[in-house]
Regions:
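Structured catalytic cores of large enzymes
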Residues: 1-177, 181-182, 188-193, 209-277
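Short, well-structured beta-strand/strand-turn elements
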Residues: 194-207
Length: 277
């Protein structure tokens, strides 16, 4: 029934938090940890708001701020009350960006809390995220209201890569398949000159079957692991994986340098969390 269904997921971790995070800037062209593009120059401030759905009067405010390769100080205020200052002192001359995360105990919370950040030295600085953690959860969602409807993106053709037999070489091409003809040329070369089996797979077909439709590099790995586990002899053992096409560090295409690119023309790259500097 509806009560059992609700109890299966409520309350969850998200019900105890309010978050402000915009990912559209990077200090360095690398990493998967992005920041908010709006710069706060010296003596400039910006007010951010966090909705308090829990109606709690106390909470823990987490502030994550970043700066370039220079010292900066950011003043933090909540609902007009100063909480403290965050000092960022770069240490490695090779790094392009630095981040400091601080927690503050906050009282007298409102239905909408205002967080003001002011750069009082150095700068410009940029926000990574603001998060408020509450001691009580937000009210349970009403199951009588309307729910979002799925968005139609495109028709998926019939496919069943879970039925694929092992091959010696897998070539993954971008979703747009603009490189299909060249990939076929390379595959034919290996079949003829190396006497190996080769399969060409568009990236989106792997996402649809191995990562629930979400562009995720783990789909590449899961597909190859399936072929490896399915192998029964050395002749059919997967030997090579070729990512045939360009990768780009900003897989979500959120930053200015990547925003105008077509994701379907690129394969996914792995970027670590701390590679932003």
């Amino acid at each position: 029934d509806s009560t059992t269904f609700l109890n299966s997921f409520y309350p969850s971790a998200n019900d105890y938090h309010s978050l402000h995070e915009i990912d559209n800037f990077s200090w360095f062209n690398g990493g998967r940890n992005l920041f908010e593009e709006t710069p706060l120059k010296i003596n400039e401030s910006k007010v951010f708001t966090l909705k308090n759905k829990t109606k709690a009067s106390t909470g823990i405010l987490t502030v994550a701020v970043t700066t370039g390769d220079y010292k900066s100080t950011i003043k933090v205020e909540a609902n007009g009350r100063e909480l403290g200052e965050i000092h960022i002192a770069p240490g490695d001359s090779f790094d392009k960006g630095y981040e400091i995360i601080r927690d503050y105990a906050v009282s007298n919370l409102q239905s909408v809390d205002s967080i003001r950040l002011t750069t009082i030295s150095g700068g410009p600085t940029r926000l990574d995220y603001l998060a408020m953690t509450y001691p009580t959860p937000a009210p349970a969602p009403s199951l009588n209201t309307s729910f979002p409807t799925p968005e139609y993106v495109y028709n998926i053709t019939n496919q069943d890569h879970h039925a694929d037999d092992p091959v010696n070489m897998v070539i993954i091409i971008p979703t747009s398949q603009k490189l299909l003809q060249q990939a076929e040329r390379l595959a034919d070369f290996h079949r003829t000159h190396d006497n190996i089996t080769v399969r060409i797979v568009p990236a989106d077909e792997l996402y649809n079957e191995f990562s629930s439709g979400t562009p995720d590099a783990m789909a590449y790995r899961r597909y190859m692991k399936m072929l490896y586990d399915r192998t029964t002899n050395a002749q059919t053992m997967p030997q090579s994986l070729l990512l045939f096409g360009d990768c780009v560090w900003d897989n979500r295409m959120n930053t200015n340098s990547c925003r105008l690119l077509n994701p379907d023309d690129y394969l996914l790259a792995y970027e670590s969390e701390n590679s932003f500097s």
